[in-house]
C-alpha cells in the first residue's frame, strides 16, 4: 500500500517547509499539499528534493471556499477567476511534478441556482482535465458532506 501525508493537515505545529522533513522522518515517500500557492515553487521543490519526497497531489485554488464562501469551480460569475486559478495551478503542478490535481466544487447557497452551478462545475472540470491531461496529470474532485461544509455541491 502506498500512502501520502497531507502536509496541510499534518505536522501543523511546524512551519510549512519543516513539515517535509517530519514526513520523511515518519517514513513517508509522498506528500500532498492542499493549497501550496503561498509558498514559492522553488522553496517547495527544494524541500521535496532535500527530503527525497514526491508531491502527488495539490488542489486547484478555491477562492474564498475555505473562508466560508462559494469558491470558484462552480460559480457561474467567476469563470475568469477560475481560468486564472487554472494557470497558477498548472505552473505549480508541472513544477512539482504532481500526478493529480483536486478541484473542489464549492458551495451553492441558493437551491434555485444549483443546476447552473453544477453545469458551470462540469464545464470547468472538463476544461481542467483537458488542460492537465497533456502533462499526464489526472483531474479529481472531492465530495465533502454538507454537515461539515454546508451547501457543498
Predicted regions mapped to residue ranges:
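N-terminal pre-domain/capping segments
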Residues: 1-94, 98, 126, 133
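Active-site acidic/histidine proton-transfer and metal-coordination neighborhood
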Residues: 72-153
Amino acid at each position: 500500500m502506498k500512502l501520502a501525508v497531507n502536509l496541510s493537515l499534518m505536522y501543523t505545529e511546524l512551519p510549512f517547509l519543516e513539515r517535509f522533513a517530519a514526513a520523511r522522518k515518519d517514513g513517508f515517500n509522498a506528500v500532498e499539499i492542499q493549497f501550496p500557492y503561498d509558498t514559492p515553487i522553488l522553496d517547495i521543490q527544494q524541500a521535496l528534493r532535500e527530503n527525497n519526497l514526491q508531491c502527488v497531489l495539490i488542489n486547484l485554488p478555491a477562492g474564498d471556499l475555505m473562508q466560508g464562501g462559494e469558491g470558484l469551480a462552480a460559480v457561474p460569475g467567476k469563470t475568469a477567476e477560475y481560468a486564472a486559478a487554472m494557470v497558477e495551478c498548472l505552473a505549480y503542478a508541472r513544477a512539482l511534478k504532481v500526478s493529480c490535481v483536486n478541484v473542489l466544487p464549492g458551495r451553492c447557497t441558493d437551491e434555485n441556482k444549483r443546476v447552473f452551478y453544477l453545469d458551470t462545475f462540469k464545464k470547468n472540470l472538463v476544461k481542467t482535465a483537458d488542460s492537465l491531461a497533456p502533462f499526464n496529470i489526472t483531474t479529481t474532485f472531492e465530495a465533502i458532506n454538507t454537515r461539515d461544509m454546508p451547501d457543498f455541491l
